[in-house]
């Protein structure tokens, strides 16, 4: 069994990678650079995680178009990365328009060429930033798209093993699978020491705190979000 895993280097994609490895898949790891502020640090995390799981087949793709399109504080340096508002129902400025569809398109192309029948992605729906392309119905629709846009004998299905989990449950799952959380990177602002106040840092810190486990990475400040 062969599978492509979309591996950003964050905690959700790390745990998803661990789940896929635990299921016995031969993994091919895909990493997308799209002009994000922490691009270099995320790539380091990707390589460390691949090394940990001994993933030999790796593909790094550069997406210039998402940063050229802009509209996100992750890719547009003129837009500030906002401080986390975890109870807000608004989609944060860190949303990159239709990012997952762009990434999944590459994953499907690669999967079809190398004969992988699964694509794993660490999307989280319920306990996350509220990005529209992380919803269950989005991935259901994309699976239908794959059926209609690939060769008749191609059988590729997207797997989202953590999509319905709370973030703290993802931490617990990761601990059960003995994942190297210290190799992962979630901060949207900094490539050196995690800021502790962006949306991604806040969600991560809250998850570890709710799980009763100290996050092993270093933070500039480490607020409580409970």
From Swiss-Prot:
InterPro entries: QueC, Rossmann-like_a/b/a_fold
Binding site for Zn(2+): 187, 195, 198, 201
Pathway stated in the Swiss-Prot or TrEMBL entry: Purine metabolism; 7-cyano-7-deazaguanine biosynthesis
Keyword DNA damage: no
Domain of life: Bacteria
Residues holding ATP: 7-17
UniProt enzyme class: ligase
Gene3D superfamilies: HUPs (3.40.50.620)
A Pfam family per the record: QueC
Known cofactor(s): Zn(2+)
Keyword Signal found: no
Underlying gene: queC
Task performed by this protein: Catalyzes the ATP-dependent conversion of 7-carboxy-7-deazaguanine (CDG) to 7-cyano-7-deazaguanine (preQ(0)).
Family label: Belongs to the QueC family.
The protein, known as: 7-cyano-7-deazaguanine synthase
One GO MF term attached to the UniProt entry: ATP binding
HAMAP family: QueC (MF_01633)
Transmembrane stretches, start-end: none
This enzyme's EC code(s): 6.3.4.20
GO BP: queuosine biosynthetic process
UniProt entry keywords in alphabetical sequence: ATP-binding, Ligase, Metal-binding, Nucleotide-binding, Queuosine biosynthesis, Zinc
Cofactor, how bound (note): Binds 1 zinc ion per subunit.
Catalytic activity: 7-carboxy-7-deazaguanine + NH4(+) + ATP = 7-cyano-7-deazaguanine + ADP + phosphate + H2O + H(+)
């Amino acid at each position: 069994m062969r599978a492509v895993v979309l591996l950003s280097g964050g905690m959700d994609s790390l745990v998803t990678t661990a789940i896929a490895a635990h299921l016995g898949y031969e993994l091919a790891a895909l990493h997308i650079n799209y002009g994000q502020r922490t691009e270099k640090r995320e790539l380091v995390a990707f390589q460390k995680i691949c090394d940990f799981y001994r993933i030999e087949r790796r593909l790094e793709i550069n997406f210039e178009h998402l940063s050229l399109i802009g509209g996100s504080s992750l890719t547009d340096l003129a837009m500030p990365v906002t401080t986390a508002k975890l109870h807000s129902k608004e989609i944060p400025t860190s949303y990159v328009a239709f990012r997952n569809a762009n990434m999944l398109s590459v994953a499907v192309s690669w999967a079809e060429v190398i004969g992988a029948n699964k694509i794993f992605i660490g999307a989280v729906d319920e306990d996350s930033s509220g990005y529209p392309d992380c919803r269950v119905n989005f991935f259901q629709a994309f699976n239908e798209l794959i059926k209609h846009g690939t060769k008749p004998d191609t059988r590729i299905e997207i797997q989202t093993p953590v999509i319905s989990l709370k973030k703290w449950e993802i931490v617990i799952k990761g601990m059960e699978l003995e994942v190297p959380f210290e190799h992962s990177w979630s901060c949207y602002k900094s490539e050196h020491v995690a800021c502790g106040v962006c949306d991604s840092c806040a969600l991560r810190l809250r998850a570890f705190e709710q799980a009763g486990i100290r996050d092993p990475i270093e933070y500039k400040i480490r607020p409580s979000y409970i």
